[in-house]
Structures are given as C-alpha cells and as structure tokens.
Amino acid sequence: MRRSLISVAILGLFTLPVAPTIAVAASTPAKLAQITTQLPRTVKPTHYDVSLVPNAAASSFAGKVRITLEVLTATTSITLNAADLAFSSAQLILNGGKTLPAKIKVNAAEQTATFTFTQPIAKGSYQLALDYTGVIGTQANGLFSMDYDTPTGRKRALYSQFENSDARRMIPSWDEPQYKATFALEVVAPDTDMAVSNMPIASKTVMADGRSLVKFGVSPKMSTYLLFFGMGDFERATASVDGTELGVVTRKGLLPQAAFALEASKVVLREYNDYFGTKYPLPKLDNVAAPGRSQFFGAMENWGAIFTFEARMLLDPSISTQSDKEEVFSIAAHEMAHQWFGDLVTMQWWDDLWLNEGFASWMQARHRPPFHPRGKAFI
C-alpha cells in the first residue's frame, strides 16, 4: 500500500521522496476496544467459497461462505474474525455430509464470532457454512461505495479495502496475514456493471431477473487482506506481458487517461519478472482506478487487482507534466513490487509490515532511474 505516513518512515532508510498528503474520507482510527488480538491456534482455513449479493442502493449485502478448514486440536468451538456482520445460520459440515448446528456468539469489541457445537470436534478436515448480511460503508474500509457525477446523473461504484484488518467486514474469516487460503468468489451484479476481483472471470450467467452471476477463478493461497472486489459502470483496456494480461479499469469515459498507467505497468512487470527471476504468478494484473482521495493511502496492492485513486493514476494528456508521469510510474512500481513483497511472500503479523513497505519502496526507487532519470533516488 502506498501511504504518506509510512513513506515518511521509509524516508529515513531509503531517502525516498515522500508522496504529498491528500485529503478526503478513509477509515477512521480504531478505538482501543476495536483493536483485536490474535485468534486461537486450534483451527486454520484452507479455502473459502464466497457468494455475495450486493445491494448498492441500500448500502448492504447478503453473503454466504463455506470455509474448508483443518481442526488442529480437538475443540468444541471455532472463533474467527467478523465485524459489522449479522449471522442468520451457521453449521459445521462433517465428512459424509452430516451437519452440526452452531450456537453463535459475536464479540463486537474484539471483532470476532465464536461458533460453539454440542459435541467435541476431532482433529481433521471440515467445512464451516455461514449465512450473513453486512454493511456497505462510505469510508475506505471493508466493502465501500463511492458516488460520483456523470453527464447522465449520479452513479455509485463499489470497491473493497481490507488492509490491514478489514476483510472481516465483508467475509467472516481468519483475518490475520499468516492464515493463507485459496478463494473462490462469486457475485450477483447488475448486468450493466463490470465486476472485478483478483482472478479473471471464469463464467458470467444472466439470471431470470436480469442480473448476472459472475464467478471468478480460484485464487492462489493468499492472506485475506489481499482479496479485492469492485463493481460499477467500468471499462477496461488490456495489454500482454510475458503471458500475463495487464489491465487498467476506470469509470466509463476515463479510460484514455489510463493509457500511461498501462504503459508504465508493462515496463515495470517486464523488468520485475527479469530481476526477481520468479515470474508474476497470476494470470492477470489489473489496476483499478477509483474516484475520491484519502489522507491515509493512495493505492493498495491487492494481488492481481491493484486499487489506485484516480488522482494517482489517471493523466489528462493535454495538461499532464513530466512530474505527473513520474508520480504515476512511481506508484505503479511500488504497488507492483508488492505483488512479490507482501503478496507472494507475506509477513506473519502486522509488526513486520515495514518489511513489505521497505522492500516495495526500495524497488520503486531502484527501477525509476532507468526510465525517468529525473526521479533518481539515493539508495
């Protein structure tokens, strides 16, 4: 994630130029009672099947998740993270298909939900099936909406922002970086909207009511904070580098302003593939532009679906300067470095987040000079 505050900290190590602070809504600092502790170590997830039905107009969504998990120590309860979610059902699916209903206890202060069963659960593999509803917020944490004006009226787009601990606002999950699992996401969306996630769309089926059921491919193992979902009146342009489909996604009508960002991504991906000796592992890498600004961050490195505020990504060719281009290039280099530092290789806990940011900032600085000499950094 590109943050102005973290950039200040990294400056002392790498003497990088600090991105200017930009203003507008983002997540508010958590109160002390909201700061969570680590989850019990008795269970770990291996796969999430997630189904979402967003209602953008009502700022709410319905969700279902079936979590494949491993019970490591016999237990009578399972605790995971959940925030601002209301559960309607919970059951554990045993081998052979038998189900055990669960008693649900939500701790709002600790942002957890505990599911207790009437009999001990032995070590082994199970599935936890949960039905729930949640809130679409207006600040950049969890699943949130952004409203904007168009010549045909006001529109609303949805995006997600999960770092550091807000995946729990969209999916009940083991929302800690050490818990990596695969994800299969499906979403019911208006047929006129584009849906974007970490993986390419595997199928899109028009339903009887005119909406579309969009299913995305299964992700590689990753931490929950790297999951992404966006939906709106978008358009997309693509290019190919080393077998990877690079994409830029914008609000309809703004795609030409993303041309430089796409070209920058082509240069950076080709260079990183060569430098690291480990090719970018996902089939596609989008950069999704969103309206608005934040004083807390400018972009986020979701694996396969980078999120960037428009002010940090889009350029009007008629008025943009060399400095503007260097800023767009710099942010692309930073967030794409995170696809290796942070996404492919992830810290176990948040106290080592500085490693993600430090390595990404180092690569951002190291690979700017060959392409934009004015942007040299001392490293």
Give short role names for the model-derived ranges.
Residues 54-56, 67-73, 134-136, 189-191:
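Beta-strand elements of well-folded, non-transmembrane domains
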Residues 84-150, 172-175, 209:
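A surface-exposed beta-strand-loop module
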